[in-house]
Regions:
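Extreme N-terminal tail/first-helix region
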Residues: 1-10
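A solvent-exposed, acidic/Ser-Thr-rich amphipathic alpha-helical stretch
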Residues: 4, 18-78
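Hydrophobic pocket/interface hotspot
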Residues: 9, 21-22, 29, 48, ...
Length: 143
């Protein structure tokens, strides 16, 4: 069930159906993209639905066909770590980009209240605070 829901959210984002994506986002949510993926003059934290859309506008300007394809989900209860493959082609350069991005989602009342993106899996796992978790971790493949 979880893998299906996550897959549907990524599919909606990849087809630019942001109204569907934002149904799962808290209006006061925060998006912390990896600084390695942003130019230095862009904000480092994006707030609320407007901030989420602002960051997507940046991605769509920079990459004609940017997408994130989810490959694995680690479920830690109130946090999900989704391994994705970011793909796109530079709008101006035409250079193809494909790299793993690890997206950590914090959930409250079933809504995303925080998203953090990492290029380093170990840093993403550290941010998920794995040592403080109790109970099993559920692993799922996205279909």
């Amino acid at each position: 069930m979880l893998a299906r829901s996550v897959g549907l959210a990524y599919a909606a984002a990849n087809r630019r159906d942001f109204d569907s994506v934002l149904v799962g986002w808290d209006p006061g949510g925060q998006y912390h993209p990896s600084g390695d993926l942003l130019p230095p003059d862009l904000e480092t934290v994006f707030y609320g639905h407007d901030g989420y859309l602002e960051l997507w506008r940046y991605w769509l300007d920079a990459f004609a066909d940017i997408r994130w394809d989810p490959e694995e989900i680690l479920d830690f209860g109130d946090r999900l770590l989704v391994t994705t493959q970011q793909r796109g082609r530079g709008s101006g350069s035409g250079v193809a980009v494909s790299e793993p991005v690890f997206q950590l989602f914090t959930l409250r009342r079933g809504l995303v209240v925080r998203q953090e993106d990492f290029l380093d899996r170990s840093k993403a796992l550290e941010a998920a605070a794995l040592p403080t978790l109790s109970g099993p971790v559920s692993r799922g493949q996205v279909r």
